[in-house]
Amino acid sequence: MPQARGEGATPPTSLPNPSLKGVPLPDNPNNLEPLTREWLAAIGEDPDREGLQRTPQRVAKAWAYMTEGYGQTLAQVVGEGVFAAEGSEMVIVKDIEFYSMCEHHMLPFYGRAHVAYIPGTRILGLSKFARIVDLYSRRLQVQERITTQVADAVEELLAPKGVAVLMEGIHLCMAMRGVQKQNSSTTTSAMRGLFRSDPRTRAEFMSAVQGTLRGR
């Protein structure tokens, strides 16, 4: 597999400027503090008791981090990490950990993402794949959408011959409430270009990641 060159290098001037946009965060994330106090009172807690006095501040800080993807763009997280291709073989980045918040119950889901592409004229610094996954995971999300957004981003950046994204997640909204199935996991995929049209290419990718899938 070809390796991306050092990320400090200057990318070719002909590369497009990525245009996927983020959503600005509120001017004052601390607005979450009074809302958290109200929420604590609504569930029957005393927000002024010793163990909860600083909880609104902690919650506001935690949610600012867990949703920082809203305030970022694809161009910002990739920076100068796109380079001219030096090969055309499949590149696979496996076992990218992700953490996100379910938009339906605002409970966490987490797991691993595997991203592959077949270069055209451009390649991407390997660490940027993790940054792209974080960009879309750190929002209120569903796993299906993250999978599609990561594939869309790689396509926009590189115009490759093919892109594959496979994500496997454990959803606490399913494990700790509702049906309460702690051993269940969800797998989603997005296949583009050669990964969709050529069964051999798709099989090569699936074979490479098979051993990392949960329960395999």
Curated annotation (Swiss-Prot):
Residues 1-33 are annotated as: Disordered. One of its GO terms (molecular function) is GTP binding. Belongs to the GTP cyclohydrolase I family. Its EC number is 3.5.4.16. Gene3D superfamilies: 1.10.286.10, 3.30.1130.10. Residues 24-33 have a biased composition (Low complexity). It comes from Deinococcus radiodurans (strain ATCC 13939 / DSM 20539 / JCM 16871 / CCUG 27074 / LMG 4051 / NBRC 15346 / NCIMB 9279 / VKM B-1422 / R1). Zn(2+) binds at C102, H105, C173. GO terms for cellular component: cytoplasm. Keywords: GTP-binding, Hydrolase, Metal-binding, Nucleotide-binding, One-carbon metabolism, Zinc. This is GTP cyclohydrolase 1. It catalyses: GTP + H2O = 7,8-dihydroneopterin 3'-triphosphate + formate + H(+). Toroid-shaped homodecamer, composed of two pentamers of five dimers. One of its GO terms (biological process) is one-carbon metabolic process. It comes from the Bacteria. Pathway: Cofactor biosynthesis; 7,8-dihydroneopterin triphosphate biosynthesis; 7,8-dihydroneopterin triphosphate from GTP: step 1/1. It holds the Pfam family GTP_cyclohydroI.
